[in-house]
Amino acid sequence: MMLRGVHRIFKCFYDVVLVCAFVIALPKLLYKMLVYGKYKKSLAVRFGLKKPHVPGEGPLVWFHGASVGEVRLLLPVLEKFCEEFPGWRCLVTSCTELGVQVASQVFIPMGATVSILPLDFSIIIKSVVAKLRPSLVVFSEGDCWLNFIEEAKRIGATTLVINGRISIDSSKRFKFLKRLGKNYFSPVDGFLLQDEVQKQRFLSLGIPEHKLQVTGNIKTYVAAQTALHLERETWRDRLRLPTDSKLVILGSMHRSDAGKWLPVVQKLIKEGVSVLWVPRHVEKTKDVEESLHRLHIPYGLWSRGANFSYVPVVVVDEIGLLKQLYVAGDLAFVGGTFDPKIGGHNLLEPLQCEVPLIFGPHITSQSELAQRLLLSGAGLCLDEIEPIIDTVSFLLNNQEVREAYVQKGKVFVKAETASFDRTWRALKSYIPLYKNS
C-alpha cells in the first residue's frame, strides 16, 4: 500500500515536471512554429486529439526512436521483423518531425504506420496506448518515456530497449531518482546494450543484471553493398565533379564545427577542392549562408540545383541525403564533434560508404566506439594542436593513406555486423508469440 502511494506521488511529480518543462520551452516552440512552420501538422497527435491508426488485424509491435539517428538504425530490424513475422502490424514513432519524415520515407513502403509520439502526459498517452494495445514495444537506444512504458506494461505488453545507451549526464539524473526511491527503468523487460560501458551504467541505476545483455552497436550494421563504385560515380556526375577533383564532405555540421571549418574551407577552395556542407538542422541553412557570405566564399544551395560546375561549395538544405552523399566524397568529417555538449553524431556512415573518416575531439555520445575506431586505425581524430588544414591537405594529397583508412574501415564494419545478428536473436526471444511457441 505504501509503495503504491509513493508510486502515485512520483507519477504526479513526473507529470508536473513535464508540464513545467513544456511551459519553459513554450516560447521557443512558438517561435519555431511561427518562423519555421514546425509542429503545426503534428499538434493534434501530440496532444492526443488524433490517434495513430494502424490498419489490419494481428498483434502490434510499436517501435520508437527519438529522432533521425535512432529511427534509421531501426531499418534492418523492421526489415527482418516484417520478413519473419508477416502477421504482425508495425507502428514507428518519433519525437521529432524530422524523425517522422525520415521514418515515412523508409517504413511506409514496407507497410508500417508512422506517427509522431504523443506527449507523455499521463492523461494523453494512456488513451493512445489503450486504443492501440501493442503486444511489444521496442525503444531505440533508450528514449523511454515513463508513462508510455507503464501504460504499455499495464495492458500486458513486453517492453525492450535495443542498441541501448545512456550518457553520463543522463545516468546522474536517473541516479537522483533512484535515491528518491524510484527506478525509472524498472518496468522495462530487457535491455540489449551497445557495450560493457553502457552495461555498467545501467547496473549503477539498479537494473537487475539478468535484464542486461551486451549485443553490440547495430548502427554499425549495413546491408551488403555490392555497387558502391557505381553509386559513387552516379553522385559525382550529379554533383558535376570532374574525375580528378577532390571532394570533402562536412556532415551534420553545427555552429561549433563551422567556426573551425570556415577558414579551412577558404584555403581548400583555393587549392581546387570542392566542399559539400551538410547542416545538422536544415532550418539553420540561413546561418550557414551568412557565414559563407561574410567570408566571401562562393556557394550554392542544393535545393536550387547547385553543383560544382560553377561553385566550389554546395550547401545541402534538404534532409535525408547525407548518408547517400557520403559515397561521393574523398574525405568525410562528422560534425558535432567540436562541441562537448553535442558529442558527435554517427561516425559509421562514412565507413559504410568506404570514405576516410575524420572527426573532432568531443565524441562523448559514442566514446567507446570512437576509441575502437582509433585503435583499429579506421578513423582519425582532429586535435586542437595541429591545424585542421594541414591534416586535411595531407590526406587529400596522399591517396595511399586514404586507401589505408578505407581498408581498415571495411574490416571494422565487417567485424561489427555480428552485432546485428546478436541483437536480432536476443530481440526474438522477447517477442511474446515467438517465445511461447
Swiss-Prot record:
**Which domain of life does this protein belong to?**
Bacteria
**Site annotation Transition state stabilizer: residues:** 141, 219
| Catalytic activity entry | lipid IVA (E. coli) + CMP-3-deoxy-beta-D-manno-octulosonate = alpha-Kdo-(2->6)-lipid IVA (E. coli) + CMP + H(+); alpha-Kdo-(2->6)-lipid IVA (E. coli) + CMP-3-deoxy-beta-D-manno-octulosonate = alpha-Kdo-(2->4)-alpha-Kdo-(2->6)-lipid IVA (E. coli) + CMP + H(+); alpha-Kdo-(2->4)-alpha-Kdo-(2->6)-lipid IVA (E. coli) + CMP-3-deoxy-beta-D-manno-octulosonate = alpha-Kdo-(2->8)-alpha-Kdo-(2->4)-alpha-Kdo-(2->6)-lipid IVA (E. coli) + CMP + H(+)
Free-text function comment from the UniProt entry: Involved in lipopolysaccharide (LPS) biosynthesis. Catalyzes the transfer of three 3-deoxy-D-manno-octulosonate (Kdo) residues from CMP-Kdo to lipid IV(A), the tetraacyldisaccharide-1,4'-bisphosphate precursor of lipid A. Thus generates the genus-specific LPS epitope of Chlamydia, composed of the trisaccharide alpha-Kdo-(2->8)-alpha-Kdo-(2->4)-alpha-Kdo.
Q: Which residues cross the membrane?
A: 16-36
* Annotated phenotype, changing residue 183 to T: In strain: Koala type I
- Major localisation: membrane
Q: Which Pfam families match?
A: Glycos_transf_N
Q: What is its EC number?
A: 2.4.99.12, 2.4.99.13, 2.4.99.14
| Location within or outside the cell | Cell inner membrane
Question: Any one cellular component term from GO for this entry?
Answer: plasma membrane
Q: Which InterPro entries match?
A: Glycos_transf_N, Glycos_transf_N_sf, Kdotransferase
Identification of the protein by name: 3-deoxy-D-manno-octulosonic acid transferase
Binding residues annotated for CMP, in chain numbering: 279-280, 319-321, 346-349
> Which molecular function GO terms apply here?
Kdo transferase activity
The keyword Transferase is assigned to this record = yes
Specify the effect of residue 401 to M. Answer: In strain: Koala type I
Which UniProt key words apply to this protein? Answer: Cell inner membrane, Cell membrane, Lipopolysaccharide biosynthesis, Membrane, Signal-anchor, Transferase, Transmembrane, Transmembrane helix
* Residue numbers annotated as active site: 70 (proton acceptor)
Of which family is this protein a member?
Belongs to the glycosyltransferase group 1 family. Glycosyltransferase 30 subfamily.
Classify the protein's membrane topology as the record does: Single-pass membrane protein
The species is Chlamydia pneumoniae
The alphabetized list of GO BP terms reads: lipid A biosynthetic process; lipopolysaccharide core region biosynthetic process
Broad enzyme group: transferase
Pathway the protein contributes to? Bacterial outer membrane biogenesis; LPS core biosynthesis
